[in-house]
């Protein structure tokens, strides 16, 4: 296993993270994602941990809290030391019928963290992430609440998921100005079939030294190997009944046309190649794997040892490249003849 620091911190996390959206009791809005019970969850956690995975991601909303409860019980059942795992969960989504049982307000955050701690059977959360964009709550209120949780020791680090780049940048600025705990990570959708974050979010992450946790690295199973131009709705795939995340299907078929031969060349699944491509991206800290079966998890774990050569990476880059979009194409045009500092210094040294 390989490890990286989590954002601009000293905390080391595995480059593959076990996602637990599939841990379910058959309730809540995520029940269709998977039906992994306690016994099966224990085996998935054990397999991941024995492969070197120390990073586990969940959310309060997954199966109405059952995912958190199952993961916490797995740690107990397996006798894993709390210090040996990095536990990430999320807050924002609706957890009750009340008007304030949702969002990133101080009140909801304070209630939600205590509920998550109880379900997870722990006294602290390593990474507490705001799961979605709250259009009502002021950023300052959210950040102050999160900072208080860090001060209290209930949370070690904080992150955010599914926010726009400008709002993440604003939050970083507010934290710096007011001395509050800052977002160290962004959890975002990123895959060969969905590279949108490269436009604005990836440059922000690099500039601010933030970590990137990737969700849906296989585009909801589209890159798993089950789908192709000639088999667009396989019967055994969740995506056939739940078409998410949104992708340009024609671009996706073109990507799969390139992905599949590379997988055959290495005698591995297309899923493993798609994950290996993500792991080759410098901006990626950790890729979240979701699995319902041990064989799926083991296949995903194999991506850590798969080395794609430059020709293969270039082929995947080219077929999945984003279409030009303003202001990106204008920036590239206007800066085409602009020398960088190293070039200028080099010329000066030799003049």
Short names for language-model regions:
Residues 1, 42, 231-265, 283-284, ...:
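Terminal-tail/helix-coil boundary detector
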Residues 1-85:
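N-terminal binding-site loop/beta-alpha segment at the start of enzyme catalytic domains
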Residues 27-28, 33, 94-196, 200:
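Glycine/proline-rich, positively charged
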Residues 11-16, 52-54, 81-85, 122-126, ...:
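Short, well-ordered coil/turn segments that N-cap beta-strands
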Residues 91-93, 164, 190-194, 216-223, ...:
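Glycine-rich beta-alpha junction loops
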């Amino acid at each position: 296993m390989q490890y990286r620091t989590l954002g601009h911190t000293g905390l080391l996390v595995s480059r593959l993270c076990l996602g637990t959206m599939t841990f379910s009791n058959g309730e809540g809005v995520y029940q269709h994602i998977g039906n992994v019970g306690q016994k099966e969850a224990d085996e998935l956690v054990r397999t991941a941990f024995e492969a070197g995975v120390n990073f586990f991601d969940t959310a309060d909303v997954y199966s109405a809290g059952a995912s958190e409860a199952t993961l916490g019980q797995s740690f107990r059942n397996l006798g894993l030391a709390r210090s040996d795992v990095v536990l990430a969960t999320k807050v924002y989504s609706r957890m009750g019928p009340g008007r304030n049982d949702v969002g990133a307000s101080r009140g909801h955050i304070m209630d939600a963290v205590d509920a998550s701690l109880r379900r997870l059977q722990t006294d602290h959360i390593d990474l507490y992430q705001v799961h979605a964009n709250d259009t009502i709550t002021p950023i300052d209120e959210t950040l102050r609440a999160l900072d208080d949780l860090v001060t209290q020791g209930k949370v070690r680090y904080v992150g955010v998921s599914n926010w726009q780049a400008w709002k993440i940048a604003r939050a970083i600025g507010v934290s710096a100005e007011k001395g509050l705990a800052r977002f160290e990570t962004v959890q975002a959708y990123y895959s060969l079939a969905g590279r949108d974050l490269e436009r604005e979010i990836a440059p922000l992450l690099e500039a601010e030294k933030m970590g990137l946790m990737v969700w849906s690295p296989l585009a909801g199973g589209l890159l798993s190997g089950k789908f192709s131009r000639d088999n667009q709705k396989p019967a055994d795939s969740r995506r056939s009944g739940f078409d998410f995340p949104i992708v340009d299907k024609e671009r996706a078929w073109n990507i799969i046309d390139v992905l599949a031969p590379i997988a055959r060349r290495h005698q591995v699944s297309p899923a493993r190649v798609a994950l290996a491509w993500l792991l080759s991206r410098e901006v990626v800290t950790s890729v979240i794997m979701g699995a319902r079966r041990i064989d799926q998890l083991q296949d995903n774990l194999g991506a850590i040892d798969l080395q794609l050569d430059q020709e293969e990476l270039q082929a995947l880059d080219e077929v999945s490249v984003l279409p030009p979009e303003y202001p990106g194409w204008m920036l590239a045009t206007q800066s085409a003849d602009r020398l960088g500092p190293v070039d200028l210094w080099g010329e000066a040294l030799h003049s």
